[in-house]
């Protein structure tokens, strides 16, 4: 059986067609019932006329509730008044399940919709979100496959923290404490010595008690590690990747973007190269718009929001102070107080979507930084081992796919960008 989008063409006008889906809207007037049916591909109006159908059939159709699952058969006609420009003149139908009252109506509050996310996913708006997310995830993988990378898998349960332990979820593992992973980075680094270029897509977990519009406690993390490249080359790859993903979304999901009131032309204009601005310069930018930041202050969500309102495409902020970043980032030889790293900030107030850096590949430097950070050396023995046996320069990054989706779709809150958001106050449905 064809989808609604496949049926809704001039080629089928005058032909007998069949569609399956769910009742999106229904109304009756003067012995005619208009049923708008939806499936994942679109909507179409099915018209049932009382004088053309058995009385019991017409009565059943006219009493269908929203989200009833149905199958309609009839002749396809053109009709400019119908939502899609086509309608099916119904001659028979089947009800899979008839609903009375669907719980979700037009004017429901945000918390109600979150409590009933399992039903709200059916809305045309959220169907658009899901389609765009699918394109984003697929495009990320396609970009790296097309450039000779290997997709790999890493553990979710770990004993060693990538960036310290204050925001880790602790789990009892047969009497031993372990943690839910925040990043696959360390494990990806082990694999560059066999595959050189690797990536992964997996959930990450952060026990941050944050209530901002862009934070989740469980989020989808896309990460890559690459042998033989430096920080600047890593940024080259990332800006090409972002442009590739955005281009695929504008090509494949123009209708979905418009459904969400996102202008595809705005996204099409965001072509690389993206500006690369040193942290010391971004502090000056912040000061110029009235933000009282000084050198050594980290950029928070609000600062990033205000700074990125100045830009019409993503920017890189590079060379952060050493004290603000994790131990595995090497110092800049020309500026020993700074590290060879970068954050990519999305424009239009969305802020950080990528964090990346060159990685320390020298054994002595790594050991010194571990000790400076007062970390347990024994917990990192296997990570340190990588610097003993054929170590090479390498770089990597982590991309928050939900944040990327939020920006691409121009959504107000990250909870709108993921099917089932997990926050400090929400673990269901």
UniProtKB/Swiss-Prot annotation:
One record GO biological process: asparaginyl-tRNA aminoacylation
Q: What is catalyzed by this enzyme?
A: tRNA(Asn) + L-asparagine + ATP = L-asparaginyl-tRNA(Asn) + AMP + diphosphate + H(+)
Instruction: List all disulphide bridges recorded for this chain.
Output: none
Domain of life from the UniProt record: Archaea
Cited InterPro entries: Aa-tRNA-synt_II, aa-tRNA-synth_II, aa-tRNA-synth_II/BPL/LPL, Asn-tRNA-ligase, Asp/Asn-tRNA-synth_IIb, NA-bd_OB-fold, NA-bd_OB_tRNA
Q: Does the keyword ATP-binding apply?
A: yes
Q: GO terms for molecular function, please?
A: asparagine-tRNA ligase activity; ATP binding; nucleic acid binding
Pfam families named in the record = tRNA-synt_2, tRNA_anti-codon
A cellular component term from Gene Ontology for this protein is: cytoplasm
Q: Which UniProt keywords apply?
A: Aminoacyl-tRNA synthetase, ATP-binding, Cytoplasm, Ligase, Nucleotide-binding, Protein biosynthesis
EC number from the UniProt entry: 6.1.1.22
Q: Could you confirm whether the keyword Hydrolase appears in this record?
A: no
What subcellular locations does the record give? Answer: Cytoplasm
Q: Which NCBIfam families match?
A: asnS, PRK03932.1, PRK05159.1
Family under the similarity heading: Belongs to the class-II aminoacyl-tRNA synthetase family.
Protein name, as recorded: Asparagine--tRNA ligase
């Amino acid at each position: 059986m064809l989808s609604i989008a496949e049926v809704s063409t001039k080629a089928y006008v005058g032909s007998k067609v069949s569609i399956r889906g769910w009742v999106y809207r229904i109304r009756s007037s003067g012995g005619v019932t208009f049923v708008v049916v939806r499936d994942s591909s679109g909507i179409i109006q099915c018209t049932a006329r009382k004088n053309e159908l058995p009385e019991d059939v017409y009565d059943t159709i006219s009493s269908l509730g929203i989200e009833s699952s149905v199958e309609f058969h009839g002749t396809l006609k053109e009709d400019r008044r119908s939502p899609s420009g086509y309608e099916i003149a119904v001659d028979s139908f089947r009800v899979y399940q008839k609903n009375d009252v669907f719980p979700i109506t037009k004017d429901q509050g945000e918390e109600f919709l979150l409590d009933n996310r399992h039903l709200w996913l059916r809305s045309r708006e959220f169907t658009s979100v899901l389609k765009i997310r699918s394109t984003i995830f697929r495009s990320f993988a396609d970009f790296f496959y097309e450039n000779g990378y290997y997709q790999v898998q890493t553990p979710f349960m770990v004993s060693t923290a990538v960036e310290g332990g204050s925001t880790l979820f602790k789990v009892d593992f047969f009497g031993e404490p372990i943690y839910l992973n925040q990043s696959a980075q360390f494990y990806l680094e082990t694999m560059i010595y066999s595959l050189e270029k690797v990536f992964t897509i997996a959930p990450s977990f952060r026990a941050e008690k944050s209530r901002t519009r862009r934070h989740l406690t469980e989020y989808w993390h896309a990460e890559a590690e690459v042998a033989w490249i430096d920080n600047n080359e890593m940024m080259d790859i990332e800006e090409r990747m972002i442009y590739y993903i955005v281009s695929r979304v504008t090509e494949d999901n123009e209708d979905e973007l418009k459904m969400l009131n996102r202008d595809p032309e705005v996204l099409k204009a965001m072509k690389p190269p993206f500006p690369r601005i040193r942290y010391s310069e971004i502090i000056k930018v912040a000061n110029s718009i009235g933000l009282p930041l000084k050198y050594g202050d980290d950029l928070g969500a609000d600062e990033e929001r205000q700074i990125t309102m100045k830009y019409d495409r993503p920017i890189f902020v590079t060379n952060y102070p050493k004290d603000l970043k994790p131990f595995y980032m090497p110092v800049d030889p020309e500026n020993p107080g700074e590290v060879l790293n970068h954050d990519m900030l999305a424009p239009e107030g969305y802020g950080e979507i990528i964090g990346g850096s060159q990685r320390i590949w020298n054994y002595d430097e790594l050991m010194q930084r571990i000790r400076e950070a007062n970390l347990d050396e024994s917990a990192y023995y296997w990570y340190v081992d990588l610097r003993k046996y054929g170590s090479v320069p390498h770089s990597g990054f982590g991309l928050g796919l939900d944040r990327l989706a939020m920006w691409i779709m121009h959504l107000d809150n990250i909870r709108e960008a993921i099917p089932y958001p997990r926050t400090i106050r929400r673990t269901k449905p």
